[in-house]
Amino acid sequence: MKDSIKLVTRLINFMKNLLPVILLAVFFAVFGFLITVYIPAKIISLGFDVLNGGKLNIFSLIILVILAVSRGLFRYGEHYFGHYVAFKVLADFRREIFAKLRRLVPSKLDSQDSGALLKLIGEDVEALEVFFAHTLAPITTGLIVSIVLILYYLHYSLQLSLIALTVYFILAVIIPNVFSSKLKPHLEIQQQYRKSYTSYFLESLKGMKDLLQLGVEKERFKNLEKESKIVNRKERNVAKLNFLQFSFSFLTIGFGVFAFAFVDFVLVKKELISIKDAVITLVVFSSSFAPFLELSRLPLGLGRALQAARQTFRLLDEKEAVGNEGNKEVEKIDEIKFENVDFSYPNRDKLIFENLDLKFEDKKIVGLVGESGSGKSTLMKIVMKWYVAKSGKISLNDDDILDIDSRKLQEKIAYIPQFPQIFSQTIRENLTLGNKNITDDEILYIAEKCRLKDKILSTENGLDTKINSERVIFSSGEMQRLELMRALLKKSDVYIFDEPTSNLDTLNESIILNLIKENCKGMVFLISHRMSTVSFADVIYKVENGKCFKI
């Protein structure tokens, strides 16, 4: 409960500058509701007047028509201002999330499941819309109209006001609270399974080409279907509770209307109120449940919204693995030195490296070999300052790596991952990554060196040809050479190749390795689990059991 109150308080603080707009939404909601209740009550009143021999007042009918039109306008105003706040805040949340991710990367994306992040950016942020558009205004509206209605019923009878108060309280407070506690564990389980399924689906989508080549796509589809059915079962459990809640809400309304009508009948029989007033109060009561039903439906939507808020604030509160506390800039990286370095990943106790002493020098191709998971890539991620060491010292030239500006350091290093990263952009944009100082002549010069110039120029629009991971116009070997082009265009001091040939045949492996040897100037790190891949390196190190030694 305390956790939920903190979340709600924090969400309100996040949009406090928009509270006047929320008040506008409440204003339109309250007056729209009062008009909704007033119209049938006025029609009943006019009907009784006609039955008692009175004349139908045309002016009253005109007023009713105006009120009916106004009801539509008030309804529009309520939704417009409520959703204006919601979508404005959602945009702010997304900006905050992307800004935070920029501060957390690359370590965050290195350790975070992409499916979970996509779910957070898309589905979780969308779920917050329920809080901003369908929680604050309805709660305030419900509170105001309940006070107005209770005072109205009290004008006729204490018993009627007590019945109304009881029914409204059950609908707006008791039912939401009871079902909120029941829904919470189901929603948490549902979130976990949806996150897992999203990740599994994305992995399947990205690896579809490999699945087709291996002929195991049918088995993968079966697993996807199985996972989907599990998610659907969890969804059904939530839906059942939601249906049960609706049933209790309408059962409460049914008993409430019956009790109200019975008391009305007794009061008429005792001549404490007139038949006309009894019918009007019953009509008002029967048409007054909309805001309270909206509140009774909150547990599901609000439960999801609060769950989403937890995930969102968890990310926004996350500390960066590496702060950008350094302000030094290295002119050129000539030497990398590790002295008594201990390292473990954030929030993990197991040491990956212990008392590591190591020295890498400029203008050498360094081979790093070892079993999968031995720490080869981790060693390079420490050099790139994705993570900081637990203890010891890492120096670039004579400067402590902690004193060097992280972004400036990473500008000096070109990292080529195992799997080529292709963005849904033109070939030029994929290669330059926003660097407008790189000319087309430079791109084509490097393309010729990497034996890709003819292939690029033969595409539909040359460098302006749009490519993406789905529209494959390059082979695996050519995609790896595109990555190499991207690295060479960066003109870095250090090149890190992480298993660059693990997915290539012998011919393409030979092409890539020769291109690396011929074109990469400066310090080159070649990570592989195969000795044959690093055989041409100037020096080879083996990473094993938390140590790195020359072989």
Name what the model sees in each region:
Residues F14-K16, P106-S107, E123-F132, L136, ...:
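An intracellular "coupling" helix at the cytosolic face of ABC transporter transmembrane type-1 domains
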Residues N17, V21-L34, L67, H134-I189, ...:
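Transmembrane helices of ABC transporter permease
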Residues S4, G32, T36-F48, L67-S114, ...:
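Juxtamembrane helix-loop junctions of ABC transporter transmembrane domains
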Residues Q213-V216, K240, S288-D317:
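Cytosolic ends of transmembrane helices, especially the final helix of ABC transmembrane type-1 domains
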Residues S60-R75, Y168-L171, N242-F258, I275-L300:
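Hydrophobic alpha-helical segments in the permease module
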Residues R95, R314, S395, D403, ...:
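ABC ATPase nucleotide-binding domain helical subdomain, centered on the C-loop/LSGGQ "ABC signature"
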Residues M1-T36, N52-S60, E78-G82, A86, ...:
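Membrane-integrated ABC transporters
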Residues M384:
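Helix-to-loop junction immediately C-terminal to a conserved catalytic motif
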